Design a protein with these regions (language model features):
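The feature marks the mature, well-folded catalytic cores of soluble enzymes
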Residues: 1-225
């Protein structure tokens, strides 16, 4: 079973390999020349950016200091809305609970939104080992699932993959893809992924997603994409 694991002891070896990887350098070079400047531009267009960031930090610190209270409040509100909250003490308990829910519906296919907790507990491999096919629907997660890799970043799971590598991955995995069809730009790659994933959404028996925020007042979950 593949789970995220600490790799600090392998840093020197991994760093040497990464510095010699020209495709990785290309992928990260695009990040440096596009994503970072775009973030700076967006922040500059929001005069209250620093104040909002400070407010978010203070809220996070407060919530972490009272997490037991807010989790119980969240559970209460979820139950009032007819939902269920399952408490799991460790990764194995969480995996077994997910499997129990899937088996209750005789699920054969599960579509997944991005969930770092799912990565941490190795839910994809666990489901596959138990006869349930997990299908990632976040584009970055879908790409690395096809490549059988782990995420390179919590926000951009496939930041380390170039467009050329994505094209090669799709041509290998999508066996019905026309060999003459161009997949040279981001728009065509996204269209190909969208066409495949739309059908998987419709076929799925169960859906799994993470959450960026849990709202204790209402029992709601918030996903930022």
């Amino acid at each position: 079973m593949t789970m995220l694991r600490p790799t600090a002891n392998e840093f020197a070896e991994n760093a040497s390999g990464a510095l010699a990887d020209t495709q990785l350098q290309e992928a990260l070079g695009i990040l440096r020349s596009h994503s970072i400047p775009n973030r700076s531009k967006a922040a500059a267009g929001l005069p209250e950016f620093e104040a909002l960031r400070d407010r978010a930090r203070d809220l996070k610190n407060h919530i972490l200091g009272h997490l037991d209270q807010y989790l119980l409040q969240f559970e209460e509100q979820v139950q009032r809305s007819g939902g269920h909250v399952h408490w799991c003490a460790d990764a194995e308990t969480a995996r077994q609970k997910v499997l129990e829910i899937c088996r209750r519906t005789n699920a054969k296919t599960v579509t997944k939104g991005k969930t770092m907790i799912g990565e941490e507990i190795g839910i994809n491999d666990f489901l596959a080992e138990n006869g349930i096919e997990p299908v990632e629907t976040d584009l970055g997660e879908y790409i690395i699932q096809l490549r059988r890799e782990t995420p390179s970043h919590i926000i951009g799971p496939a930041l380390h993959v170039t467009k050329k590598q994505v094209e090669e991955t799709f041509r290998k995995a999508h066996t019905d893809l026309d060999a003459n069809r161009s997949l040279e730009d981001a728009a065509s790659l996204m269209a190909e992924a969208r066409a495949k994933l739309r059908d998987r959404f419709l076929e799925a028996d169960v859906g799994i997603t993470g959450a960026n925020f849990l709202i204790a007042d209402t029992g709601s979950t918030v996903i930022v994409t």
